[in-house]
Structure formats: structure tokens, C-alpha cells
């Protein structure tokens, strides 16, 4: 029996642990996905509620994933990748969320919004839209600057 007094946000292995804690199973990806960008579609629920784009790119580093054939009845899918991997889960009753990707990664542009949505579930004030846009513009500018640096000078 689960009693969640505090909101929980699982990232990558934490996402998989949430799935398994409720009786789900994992599947092994072949090949593993490490440092790759993937498009994710979401339903604007849970930690995705502040993301206006129906589809966006995220950074993935994993070789295991929640098996959709064994999804626990207490959880529902909030996001999936184009290749059918569960990328977001949410508990039906408690404030328990998981994402398979890394919202903290520099290449996951909606990461600020995802983390902010979770923090709002914890009672913290989320950023204003103008602050999100400012952070995202700075991040995109930084990525463009880093990409211009030659790797083999």
C-alpha cells in the first residue's frame, strides 16, 4: 500500500523505479540510447502541463524502459517517443511523476518548464512565461555558440 506524503519526481532510473514499485516491468532497448535527441509527444498532464508544444525534443540516456504491456493500473502514460517508448508516467491518485529522459540536460529545451511544473506541485511558485522564454533563448544561444567550437583544432 502506498502513502505519498510528498510529491515524487523520478528521472530516468527514477522513472523506471516508479514503474517497478507499482508492479510494472522493464524491457531492454536494442540498441541502447545514449546522448540522443528524440521527439516526444505528451498529453499536457502532470509535469507536461506548462508545455504548449504537443511535440518536443528531449535528451535520452538509457538502455531500459517501462514495458507498456505491463503498465501498472495505478499509473498512466503522459508522454511517449516516436518509437513507442514510454517517456512520461503519472500516478492516478498521488503526485508521483516520472520521465525517462533528462529534463536537466542542456539539449532538453522544455526542461525548465517540466522541472518548474513539478516544483509547483511541491508548493513553489513557478516561473513566469517571460522568464521561461528568456532562459530558453539563453540556452539556445549557448548551444549555438558551443556548436561553433571546433572539436579538433
Named regions from a protein language model:
Residues 12, 62, 102:
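Histidine-centered divalent metal-coordination motifs
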Residues 37-39, 86-88, 98:
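Conserved hydrophobic/aromatic beta-strand scaffold that supports enzyme active sites
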Residues 46-94:
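Catalytic beta-strand/loop cores that center a nucleophilic Ser/Cys/Thr
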Residues 55, 100-109:
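Phosphate-binding/catalytic loops
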Residues 106-153:
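Acyltransferase
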